[in-house]
Amino acid sequence: MVNSKQKGNSGERAIVKILNEFYNTNEFKRVPMSGAFSTIHKNNLTESEAHVFQGDIITPDFFEWVIEVKNVKDVNLYKIFTDCGHTKWDEQLEKERENIKNKKGVILVFKQNNREWLCKVFKKDFTIEVVPRMEFVDSYILLFSDLLNFYLNNK
């Protein structure tokens, strides 16, 4: 049986590696204990510390979004499509968006076993046109690699 915490941690490490290689840096890092850290310690964090511990990945100043990572056994894309792009993580993403400091928005990066990394971005967080795999009223779902290539090429 797979430990879901270990699976989540391995997903976060994979995204950190992808981002560091893509941007030729080592500034992307996992948030210690991921989302649990800021939940447990949020009252003891200064505003600048809280800024660093947004999402699952610590991002450099040049990177404009908070990143949430989900590495799961199954992703029901049919359900996402028939629910107008909504995922089971949307409530968490909206809470994250409400607390964002110094970033444009949230990117949900998710992966099903043995598949490529996908991502969900909200249209209100992007002022540029993204070429999506799926487009919905309020969001896009696309390959994470497409988002990186688009973002880097249109910065």
Name what the model sees in each region.
Residues 1-155:
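Catalytic phosphate/metal-binding cores of nucleic-acid and nucleotide-processing enzymes, i.e., regions
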